[in-house]
């Protein structure tokens, strides 16, 4: 399927799209390059800015996958399903040929964090553990935590399914757990999200991200939480409405600069749209085969940027 999209990408004329929502992202890149401060960070020099917000429509199945470079959407989607299952075992991603967590789960990296007790590929109590078993004592990535900790995601689902509670202002899911930060391979960057239902029917998600790698990570986070909103809307009998992205520390790594300067000169295409075809009994049963492309993902060519562990 990806080959078909690549073919479409090559054949489509490069015409200006009325995709003003992606232009928000391109403007963020430009602003950081032009006005950001140069900082020496944990893993390299960055152009840095603090505090930004972007808003994307999810109406009619739209999903904001950045088009001014080719995004590895399958990798992004599979990572989300892995989070939803509550997994922290990188081996499961490796088996799907997804390597985005390899550096952070290597023996050397875990040792650098003082996590000598974790075996290689065990990421500790990161996103999935906090979403499904918040603050449950973490043993290892093979332990069954069913019934332990707080299942934040299931709580939100239960509230959304009930017309009497779906307008609650407490539909919050946090991956930031100060009690377990030092046990994680990497503290959560996208740390807290809140869901909101408008007029009893339209579901939106707001994400606060404390640290945003604007070149690589932020496009993944936009697509991932937008897909999560679509899945929850389907699962709970609602319609996806908007994704709102709040960013704290927004940064561009110095060695991403050349690629991003190419990207900001490109004109975006329209965002694709999807349908969640099946409705499962349990949220963890959704998988990539449940996604149907209504309007395909068309993009410019990929741009190489190194991930900073």
Residue ranges and their predicted role:
Residues 5-309:
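Terminal, non-catalytic protein-protein interaction segments that mediate quaternary/complex assembly
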């Amino acid at each position: 399927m990806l080959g078909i999209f690549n073919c479409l990408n090559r054949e489509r004329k490069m015409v200006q799209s009325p995709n003003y929502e992606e232009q928000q992202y391109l403007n963020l890149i430009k602003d950081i390059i032009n006005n950001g401060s140069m900082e020496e960070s944990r893993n390299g020099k960055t152009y840095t800015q603090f505090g930004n917000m972007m808003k994307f429509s999810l109406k009619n199945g739209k999903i904001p996958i950045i088009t001014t470079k080719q995004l590895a959407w399958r990798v992004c989607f599979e990572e989300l399903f892995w989070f939803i299952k509550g997994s922290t075992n990188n081996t499961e991603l490796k088996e799907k040929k997804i390597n985005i967590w390899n550096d952070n789960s290597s023996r050397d990296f875990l040792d650098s964090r003082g996590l000598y007790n974790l075996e290689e590929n065990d990421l500790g109590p990161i996103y999935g553990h906090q979403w499904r078993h918040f603050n449950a004592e973490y043993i290892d990535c093979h332990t069954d935590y069913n019934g332990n900790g707080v299942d934040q995601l299931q709580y939100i689902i239960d509230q959304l399914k009930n017309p009497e509670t779906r307008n609650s202002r407490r539909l919050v899911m946090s991956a930031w757990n100060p009690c377990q930060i030092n046990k994680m391979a990497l503290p959560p960057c996208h740390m807290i999200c809140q869901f909101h239902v408008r007029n009893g029917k339209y579901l939106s998600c707001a994400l606060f991200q404390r640290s945003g790698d604007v070149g690589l990570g932020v496009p993944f986070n936009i697509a991932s939480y937008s897909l999560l909103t679509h899945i929850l809307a389907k699962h709970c009998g609602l319609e996806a409405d908007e994704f709102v992205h709040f960013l704290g520390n927004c940064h561009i790594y110095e060695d991403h600069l050349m690629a991003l300067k190419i990207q900001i000169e490109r004109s975006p295409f329209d965002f694709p749209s999807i349908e969640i075809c099946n409705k499962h009994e349990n949220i963890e049963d959704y998988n990539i085969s449940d996604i149907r492309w209504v309007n395909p993902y068309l993009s410019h060519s990929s741009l190489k940027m190194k991930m900073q562990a």
